[in-house]
Amino acid sequence: MARDSALNVSVGIIAAVMICVAASQASDVFAPFALALFIIALVWPLQSWLQARMPALLALAITMTVTVAVCIAFASLVAWAFGRVGVSLLADTARYQALYQRAIDWLEDRGISVAGLWSEHFNVGWLVHWAGQITGRVNTTLSFWLIALLYVILGLMEVDDLRRRAQAYLRPETARILLQGSAATAVKIRKYMEVRTLMSVATGVLVGLFAWVAGLHFALEWGVIAFALNYIPFIGPFVATLFPTLVAMTQFESWEAAVGVFVCLNIIQFVVGSYIEPRVSGAMLAMSPTVVLLAVFLWTYLWGLFGAFIGVPIVIAIVTFCAHHPSSRWIADLLGGPVEKNDLARA
C-alpha cells in the first residue's frame, strides 16, 4: 500500500514536470488557449442569456463585440498611462544618474565602498532603460490575441455540444467531474475577477488620490497604472510602487521624499491586498499565499507577463477540479481548502 502511494506520488510529480515543460515549449499554442478558456468562463453568462432570447450567432456577435471593446478600452487606457510615464522616465535619465552618484558619494564618505561592486552589476541608465522598455512593451502580440479570440468564438459555439457529448460518451462519474468541475471553476474565476476588479479600482483611486495630495506628477496616470497592475499578484503592485518612486526622486530631489512615497504606496497596497481583499473574497477563493506566489513566478517563468496574470486562475482551476474527486480532494484541502457546498449549488 505504501509502495503504491509512493508510486502514485512519483508519477504525479513526473507528470507535473512534463506538463510544465510542454507548456513552456508549446507556449504559442497553450497560452492563447488558456486565455480563451479564461475569457469563455467570464463571458459565458452573457452568451447564455443572449442566446436564450435570440439566434445563437447574433448572441455570439454581441458577446464578441462587447469582449473586444472591453479589451481595447483597457489596453488603450493602460498604454496611455504607461506611455506618458515612460517618456518622463527616459527624459530624466541624466538626473537619475546624478542622484545615483550622490548616493554612492554619501556612502563612501561614511566608509561604505560600493562603487566598484555596483558599477559592475548596476547602472541607473540601464535601470531607466529597462523601466522604459517595460512601460512600452506589450508581451502579447496581435497574433496571440487573434488566436485567442478565434478559440473564444469556437469555444462559445461548442459549449452546449461539448456538454451533451460528455454526458453521452463519457462514464457518468467522469462526466460529473468534468461538468461540475468546469462549472465550479467558471464560477470561481468570475468571482476572482469580480473581487480583483473591485480591489484594483480601490487601489487605483487611493494611489491617485495620494499622488494628487502629495503633489506627485502624473497623479491620474499613477492611479490607472496601479489599477491595471493590481491584476497581477505580487509583481504588479511592486512595479506600481516602483515607478512613482523613481519619478519622486527627480521631482522632489530628495531621497527622503522618495522613500516616503514608496512606503505610503506600499501601505496602500498592503491594506487593500492583505486586509480588505481576503474579507471581500471570503472562503470561496481562499488559497495559501505561498501557493499564489509560486503560481505567479512559475507561470511568469513559463509564459512571461501573461503567465503572471493567468497563473492564479490556473491554480483555481486545478484546486477546483481536485476537490471534485475523492482521490485528489486532499490536494484541494492542502492548497485551497475544501469545496464549498454553496459554490456547487451556485454552479
Which residues are covered by each model-predicted region?
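Hydrophobic transmembrane alpha-helices
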Residues: 36-43, 152-155, 224-231, 235-238, ...
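Membrane-interface starts of transmembrane alpha-helices
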Residues: 54-63, 175-178, 236-239, 288, ...
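Alpha-helical transmembrane segments and their immediate interhelical loop/hinge regions
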Residues: 6-8, 137, 141-251, 255-263
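Generic alpha-helical transmembrane segments of integral inner-membrane proteins
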Residues: 13-18, 22, 61-74, 142-149, ...
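Hydrophobic alpha-helical transmembrane segments of membrane transport and translocation systems
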Residues: 258-347
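Membrane-water interface of transmembrane alpha-helices in multipass transporters/channels
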Residues: 27-35, 213-224, 252-260, 287-292, ...
